[in-house]
Regions:
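Active-site-proximal, substrate-binding regions of enzyme catalytic domains
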Residues: 4-235, 243-245
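Charged catalytic cores and adjacent phosphate/nucleic-acid-binding surfaces used
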Residues: 240
């Protein structure tokens, strides 16, 4: 007689005890975006993620699909991150100048009005002018400090040729890379994926109309299943995607 727990195991929430055992013994793997996001995040966030991956040392594995997608997109992500950094600096500088200019104009208008008032002493007006002018300079200095933080040694300095993040990824996953599919195997998987996509069966059916990497999520899922079965171990997949498929 069939067991409900065995038949519908995928639909039954696991207990806290089972979760604890999984975290203690399972293999950790990541999707492509987790690796690429290391170039997009603030350096401190990147360090924390890499430290978290390192804490699983001896229990990590990287699928061939993710490694392929990572190296295909790495250079573009690095260059895009650099462009975003420059754009951020320019926005801060522009906003600072705009605020300083607006305050100075308002201050000049105020002082002109006070100067025409004979009941107010020139000394008081000069003191007010010097004090308020100092505040506008403080705004400019604050902007400079923010930009220095953008461009300081704390900011991840990465180029396609000089890449400490890549070195760390290799150090963590180097000897734990999964196998690729053979040509015939991949052709058969594409046939299966097409049928699944027609019936909105995850993973990956939302990518059906993509021109590039249409079956990437499905290939990753298949490689994880094969690895878990081969090693007879649970696998934890860390992903930053939030798509329904």
């Amino acid at each position: 007689m069939a067991s409900i727990k065995e038949t519908f195991e995928w639909a039954i929430p696991i207990s806290d005890e089972e979760k604890s055992k999984i975290w203690e013994k399972a293999i950790l793997t990541v999707d492509t975006n987790v690796l690429l996001d290391l170039y997009r995040f603030h350096p401190e966030t990147t360090r924390q993620i890499l430290n978290g991956l390192e804490s699983f040392k001896g229990r990590v594995w990287l699928s061939h699909q993710v490694a392929s997608e990572f190296f295909k997109n790495r250079n573009k992500v690095i260059l895009d991150a650099e462009k975003n950094l420059i754009a951020g600096e320019e926005k801060i500088t522009s906003l600072s100048k705009e605020i300083e200019s607006t305050l100075n104009k308002a201050l000049d208008t105020l002082l002109d009005g006070l100067s025409s008032n004979r009941t107010i002493s020139k000394k008081l007006i000069d003191n007010l002018k010097n004090g308020l002018k100092g505040k506008t300079h403080e705004i400019a200095e604050l902007s400079d400090d923010i930009i220095k933080n953008f461009t300081s040694e704390e900011t991840t300095k990465v180029t396609p040729q000089k890449d400490d993040i890549l070195l760390k990824i290799i150090e963590i996953f180097n000897k734990n890379l999964g196998d690729s599919f053979g040509v015939k195997d991949q052709e058969n998987l594409i046939i299966i994926a097409k049928e699944r996509y027609k019936n909105k069966i995850p993973p990956g059916y939302k990518d059906e109309n993509k021109e590039d990497n249409t079956y990437g999520d499905f290939f990753l899922w298949e490689q994880i299943l094969r690895y878990a079965e081969k090693e007879n171990k649970s696998v934890i997949l860390v992903t930053s995607e939030q798509k329904e498929d």
